Amino acid sequence: MTEYNPRDLADLVIKPIITEKATLLLEQNKYVFDVLPKATKPEIKAAIESLFDVKVTGVNTIKPPRKKRRVGRFIGHKPLYKRAIITLEEGDTINLFPDV
């Protein structure tokens, strides 16, 4: 097992994703996060376990194709991003909506 620096791991996870599909996955104890495109599955697993103090059983990643964007006569692309679907062990939860 490789040791990771906790400071570097915190930078891998950008934000949680709250969409209709992501909330349906919450019922299956799966959470969706945007992560850096260079992040690997073992790094994502270590980052989630250290940030939220939970046990991760699986990591699935999605790297969708970039969409074209036009500004005047110039054609560019939206930034590349990567999504991670995290499966947690039974009984573990991540509190995405803290009590106000």
Curated annotation (Swiss-Prot):
Superkingdom of the organism of origin: Bacteria
Keywords: Ribonucleoprotein, Ribosomal protein, RNA-binding, rRNA-binding
Gene Ontology terms describing biological process: translation
Pfam families: Ribosomal_L23
InterPro entries recorded: Nucleotide-bd_a/b_plait_sf, Ribosomal_uL23-like, Ribosomal_uL23/eL15/eS24_sf, Ribosomal_uL23_CS
HAMAP family from the UniProt entry: Ribosomal_uL23_B
Described function: One of the early assembly proteins it binds 23S rRNA. One of the proteins that surrounds the polypeptide exit tunnel on the outside of the ribosome. Forms the main docking site for trigger factor binding to the ribosome.
Subunit annotation: Part of the 50S ribosomal subunit. Contacts protein L29, and trigger factor when it is bound to the ribosome.
Similarity section: Belongs to the universal ribosomal protein uL23 family.
Protein name as it appears in the record: Large ribosomal subunit protein uL23
Gene that produces this protein: rplW
